[in-house]
């Protein structure tokens, strides 16, 4: 792998919610050059169906499993409606990013711009001299939030793995073949969930040492298969014998709504996968249709799982719906199967942050120390995600915090501002400016309030939510 310093012309965009190595260069960032991007129809093209599948892959992750709790935090009526609104706004922001990237590509005569490049060159269109002179900070800001997002995903994976394995092991003696009823189980106490996280640490460190995306693509395939099968089994259970929902609140207390926002925007933060997929699509003129179709499917999936999961388990819903599944071998296997998928996905999410941070560090050391420094930095980064997960061992709070801090910036705040600065000098209607300002304000309010409420809940958990929101609690 090349260890040269990251440069604008070398940087390849891996800013997807779930990285898809199949369509990425095997040598990572160092081997990328603008000429390696071929407009669809040349070398590396994808059909509309392949693009749709990759779009679905890039938006479905652990955030999906936390949506039933998110609906609880918003209410049975307000939750699904809010998911629909956030989904529409998120898709609109994806469209803004694609439009601005196309405009700047034509203006600068470049074959492709990733998210960071688009923001950087967009700032160069600003009427402010100071902003133009500091446009390189646009890329740095995108990279910063991308790193926070991807390492935040890794923290979520640590908590998810620990909670699910802990539950399966503690309930092993009481596991039956009867999956008809979701009965209460008295678990056999084992070690603390934080010790489970430490148990996974050495294996995830070794997994992070894989630096070739072609090798990681094998793990990506295994992860996709295991998670797909698990989702089918989860849906199969939650649609059966739904209890009377009359006791569930249509609108939850306002104090928990920011937690809903963080989780929802965490789930919808797949904006980084949009530009690479559009660039590789054979008939790129059809990409907007594929984008809207794919995100419509994802929005329906999110709303249905969130609503049905909350209807099925009510106030007892956990930070991940897998923790509410019955204590029978079939659904215990589902927990393990999904956990296996998450385990392998860790390396793919970690790769994104590693390929931004490591080249800049390794380029400063002598060549014969490059490999050692590379591996040491990878080890340190994995350890950091483990420590953060140990410090915040509640899955719902980790998801909400990551969503509020970084996902809101990438998905809601930056794209509307980018549209304003990109088209400001060419004439932009006041209505568009107003619309973009409202979206950015929505994202910023969610950023501030969601982060504040997540931290408050972390420091001083509310009595009503401390047991139901914690993934450490048992069914």
From Swiss-Prot:
One of its GO terms (cellular component) is lysosome. Residues 1-15 have a biased composition (Basic and acidic residues). It is found in: Cell membrane; Apical cell membrane; Lysosome membrane. It comes from the Eukaryota. Glycans are attached at residues 173, 182, 469. One of its GO terms (biological process) is glycine transport. It catalyses: glycine(in) + H(+)(in) = glycine(out) + H(+)(out); L-alanine(in) + H(+)(in) = L-alanine(out) + H(+)(out); D-alanine(in) + H(+)(in) = D-alanine(out) + H(+)(out); L-proline(out) + H(+)(out) = L-proline(in) + H(+)(in). Highly expressed in small intestine, colon, kidney and brain. Residues 1-50, 99-140, 211-214, 278-288, 363-371, 418-438 are cytoplasmic. Disulfide bonds join 179-328. Coiled coil: none annotated. It is a multi-pass membrane protein. The keyword Cell cycle does not apply. Electrogenic proton/amino acid symporter with selectivity for small apolar L-amino acids, their D-enantiomers and selected amino acid derivatives such as 4-aminobutanoate/GABA. May be involved in the efflux from the lysosomal compartment of neutral amino acids resulting from proteolysis. May play a role in specifying sites for exocytosis in neurons. This is Proton-coupled amino acid transporter 1. It comes from Mus musculus (Mouse). The lineage of its organism: Eukaryota, Metazoa, Chordata, Craniata, Vertebrata.
């Amino acid at each position: 792998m090349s260890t040269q310093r990251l440069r604008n012309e070398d940087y390849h965009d891996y800013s997807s919610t779930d990285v898809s190595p199949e369509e990425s260069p095997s040598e990572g960032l160092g081997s990328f050059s603008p000429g390696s991007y071929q407009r669809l129809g040349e070398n590396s093209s994808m059909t509309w169906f392949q693009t749709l599948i990759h779009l679905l892959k890039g938006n479905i992750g652990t955030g999906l499993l936390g949506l039933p709790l998110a609906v609880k935090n918003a209410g049975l009526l307000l939750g699904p409606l809010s998911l629909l609104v956030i989904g529409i706004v998120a898709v609109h922001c994806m469209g803004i990013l694609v439009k601005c990237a196309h405009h700047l590509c034509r203006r600068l005569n470049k074959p492709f711009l990733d998210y960071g490049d688009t923001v950087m060159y967009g700032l160069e269109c600003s009427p402010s001299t100071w902003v133009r002179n500091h446009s390189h900070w646009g890329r740095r800001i995108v990279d910063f939030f991308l790193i926070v997002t991807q390492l935040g995903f890794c923290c979520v994976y640590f908590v998810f793995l620990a909670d699910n394995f802990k539950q399966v092991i503690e309930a092993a003696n009481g596991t039956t073949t009867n999956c008809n009823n979701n009965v209460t189980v008295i678990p056999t106490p084992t070690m603390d969930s934080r010790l489970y996280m430490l148990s996974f640490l050495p294996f995830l460190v070794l997994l992070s040492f894989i630096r070739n995306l072609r090798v990681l693509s094998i793990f990506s395939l295994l992860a996709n298969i295991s998670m797909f099968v698990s989702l089918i089994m989860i849906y199969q259970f939650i649609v059966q014998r739904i209890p009377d929902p009359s006791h569930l609140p249509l609108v939850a207390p306002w104090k928990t709504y920011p937690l809903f926002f963080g989780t929802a925007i965490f789930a919808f933060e797949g904006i980084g996968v949009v530009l690479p997929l559009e660039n590789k699509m054979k008939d790129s003129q059809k990409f907007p249709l594929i984008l809207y179709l794919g995100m419509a499917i994802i929005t329906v999936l999110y709303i249905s799982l969130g609503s049905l999961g909350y209807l099925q388990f009510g106030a007892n819903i956990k930070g991940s719906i897998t923790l509410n599944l019955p204590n029978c071998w079939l659904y215990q296997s589902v927990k393990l199967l999904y956990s296996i998928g998450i385990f392998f996905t860790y390396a793919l999410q970690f790769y994104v942050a590693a390929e931004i941070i490591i080249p800049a560090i390794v380029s400063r050391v002598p060549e014969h120390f490059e490999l050692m420094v590379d591996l040491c930095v990878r080890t340190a980064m994995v350890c950091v995600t483990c420590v953060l997960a140990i410090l915040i061992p509640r899955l719902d709070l980790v998801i909400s915090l990551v969503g509020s801090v970084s996902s809101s910036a990438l998905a809601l705040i930056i794209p509307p501002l980018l549209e304003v600065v990109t088209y400001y000098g060419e004439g932009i209607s006041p209505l568009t400016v107003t619309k973009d300002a409202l979206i950015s304000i929505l994202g910023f309010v969610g950023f501030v309030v969601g982060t504040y409420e997540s931290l408050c809940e972390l420091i001083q958990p509310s009595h009503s939510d401390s047991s139901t929101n914690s993934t450490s609690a048992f069914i």
